[in-house]
Amino acid sequence: MNTLHILFAKFRRRALTLAKGIGALLLSSVLLAGGCQQNPSIDQATGAQDAESTPALVTVSPRKSPNDTREYRYLTLPNQLKVLLVSDPETDKSAAALAVYRGSFHEPDSRPGLAHFLEHMLFIGTETYPAVDSFQQYITANGGSSNAYTALDHTNYFFDIKNSALAEGLDRFGHFFIDPLLSPEYVEREKNAVHSEYQMQIKDDGWRGYMVSKQALNPEHPGHRFTIGSLDTLQGNVKADLDRWFAQNYSADQMGLVVLSNASLDDLQALVEPLFNQVPNYNIGPDYPTVPAYTDAQLPAMITSQTQKNAVRLSIAFPVPSTLPYYRTKPEQYISNMLGHEGEGSLHSLLIQRGWIESLGAGTQSFDRNTSLISANFELTQAGSNHVPEIMGLFFAHIDMLKSVEPEAWRYTEQAKVAELAFQFQERGSTVGFVYQMAPRLNEYPPEDLLAAPYLMEGFKPDLIKDLLARMTPENVLVELAMPDFQSPTVEPWFAVPFALTQGPVPVAMPDNPPLNLPAANPFLPENLSLLEPDDAPIDLAVDQPGLQLWLDTDVSFTTPRANIAIELAVPGGLISLRDASMARLFTRLVNDELTQSTYPALLAGLGYNL
């Protein structure tokens, strides 16, 4: 079974908010799932509600971009299952995702990987559709695909399919959560499938780094555990544990469904409501870890580990109180945007000039409902690997510079403008990508903000910014350094990664008067976003002279205020040798590096280039 683990939503250059993935996702293909069995018995005394006796709640229309032509409707079914319906008459595929707000955090200590194992078992069959693997066969036969992943705090199931087959596809999908068979005769097969995924990841540097990072967590926190599962962790009478865990954790009040199709909202509601209202509701309520992820006993700390690939990575992370309650104002984004800036006078620019890094990115991620991580990731050069204390010193000097000045409203306003532009003119991805990203969001934000939440910056809160900065100190830091030539007699127990954990002061060489400056105002932020008048004239050859031709065309059909400019430089004689091609490639990389400082503000404003 193929597995994708999003470990470090990798810090990409020029990104506004990215994340270090200690709260990673385990994404597993369902192509090998199979089997059938009786639905586990559920004790009705646990509080299952009669869905017919509870009226549906009032529907809500989430606020959306003015350029978004889709229609949205949020509703809560009588059984308390949250639903977001999306009508897109232009889509050629329908898609659906259901997130269960229970994941690896909620497993018993004795059964690491049980949530992931249940994810596999649900695809085997249901009482209504008992044929083994029939769901996947139906989806594939109708031009679609399906998948699922198990995260720390939720499990997410999703599929896409041609529009005409949505009704039956959704019915088959819904019965995963109504009458799954969880067949005992397929337990061994799926245990082996889970174990195979575990074995596949043992040499993966993302997984290796993720597992090593757990060594610095509070051992009482559920995030400290192994999560994939293996033959060892799933041995014995796992079927009884599986049935019990399903009955205790898969309840309608802790589920969120997103359905996108070309049908109208009324038609989608008529399809979804009678089906998913059958999912039992046991009113189990939310369940989040209460144990702190890190205590004074864990931090400060530095973990050094071995990589398989020839790459050196440095991560510097600060646990802070969860920033999720402040999603409308995002004080953490003010900080990460400053730390990750790549313009003149930035930390990125200085470290590039010294030849110590290949890239730098900064961002924030929620680890659990109590803790967020503000972090920076560096990809180091070979020279940089010999200057880690100096790099850390410059990083803390940059933080000290931010602390030395009051947070500035004009900077926040500028960042809010960038976020507003990103929301207003966002480009659509795949339908299935949209639904599986939205399903967990139904548990994080109020209905009216489901679409806008990641982009909102609606109030400058300098005190919140200063409070976060005050927590970004060498005494409250987790440093992770991964390099290929590191050796240690201590190995991580599940992935056998050589590592060393040092708890106590981290190596920081503070510089004297480093040449660091805060970013200047961005001159590229647009003021006028009105579209040009439609022009049916043919493409115009505006300039035609020796060595230069310029063609112009006006196209407002995409209703976005963007211009695409393509410039082709003709090389006399062409690239006729391997050396010519190599030199041209090297030239473009050098030019791109040279332009980074001057073009970064333009990139933040939505202007991009590719050489």
Question: Which role fits each region the language model picked out?
Answer:
Residues 32-35:
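C-terminal motif of bacterial Sec signal peptides marking the signal peptidase cleavage site
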Residues 37-39:
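Bacterial signal peptide processing site
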Residues 95-160, 203, 207, 224-230, ...:
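M16/MPP (pitrilysin/insulinase) zinc-metallopeptidase core fold and M16-derived inactive scaffolds
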Residues 124-128, 160-191, 370-427, 572, ...:
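M16/insulysin-pitrilysin zinc metalloprotease superfamily fold
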